[in-house]
């Protein structure tokens, strides 16, 4: 299936997504087409760790508009949940309904061109997951288009679990000392907090590309 070709890691967790796919930075940049955004599509995803941010641009705004690529929950172009912010070309409503358990909360579309092997990616919100929930993959469907193969990934809201005693609560990835990605796995019990200090990571792992995974536990 098309989805399996993009399988890599959990996109964003705890108020963002558990979609297993590659982001722009993990694919060869030459494989990605930043096409003009569809109406109501997310143009960028921003993650924040302490005061650092990482921006993943998904498409280009048309009609003379620009995608706001900086963290600002009050710009009228954003949906903000915890350390994640999604940007839109046009002013967006902050009053999206809260998702029900059975509702399709978010959709991703991937359009792979058979000749060029280029991929177009678009993200759409239908509703927002409640607090302490995340977006969980539940369905994939494929459609043949005149110019390639279209895969639609659908997600629902799932409640995040409380961390067990020795469980990793989050993973933070850096490259050359700069923040790239945060993946929250569970929430800490009681008065404990998930460590954010990279110098106090409970474990680290260095990837072949020089990226460093910092694994944190509750303290």
UniProtKB/Swiss-Prot annotation:
Expressed by the venom gland. It is found in: Secreted. One of its GO terms (molecular function) is toxin activity. GO terms for cellular component: extracellular region. Residues 17-25 form a propeptide. Belongs to the scoloptoxin-11 family. This is Kappa-scoloptoxin(11)-Ss1a. Contains 8 disulfide bonds. Keywords: Cleavage on pair of basic residues, Disulfide bond, Ion channel impairing toxin, Potassium channel impairing toxin, Secreted, Signal, Toxin, Voltage-gated potassium channel impairing toxin.
């Amino acid at each position: 299936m098309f989805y399996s070709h993009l399988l890599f890691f959990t996109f964003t967790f705890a108020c963002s997504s558990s979609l297993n796919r590659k982001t722009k930075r993990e694919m060869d940049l030459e494989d990605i087409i930043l096409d003009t955004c569809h109406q109501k599509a997310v143009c960028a995803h921003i993650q924040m760790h302490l005061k650092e941010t990482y921006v993943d641009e998904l498409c280009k705004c048309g009609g003379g508009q620009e995608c706001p690529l900086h963290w600002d929950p009050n710009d009228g172009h954003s949906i903000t949940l915890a350390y994640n912010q999604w940007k839109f070309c046009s002013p967006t409503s902050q009053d999206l309904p809260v998702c029900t358990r059975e509702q399709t909360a978010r959709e991703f579309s991937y359009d792979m061109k058979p000749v060029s092997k280029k991929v177009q990616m678009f993200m759409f919100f239908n509703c927002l997951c409640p607090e302490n929930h995340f977006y969980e993959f539940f369905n994939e469907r494929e459609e043949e288009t005149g110019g390639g193969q279209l895969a639609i990934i659908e997600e629902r809201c799932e409640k995040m679990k409380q961390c067990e005693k020795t469980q990793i609560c989050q993973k933070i990835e850096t490259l050359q000392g700069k923040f790239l990605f945060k993946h929250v796995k569970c929430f800490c019990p009681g008065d404990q907090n998930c460590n954010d200090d990279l110098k106090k990571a409970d474990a680290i792992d260095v990837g072949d590309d020089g990226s460093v995974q910092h694994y944190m536990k509750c303290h």
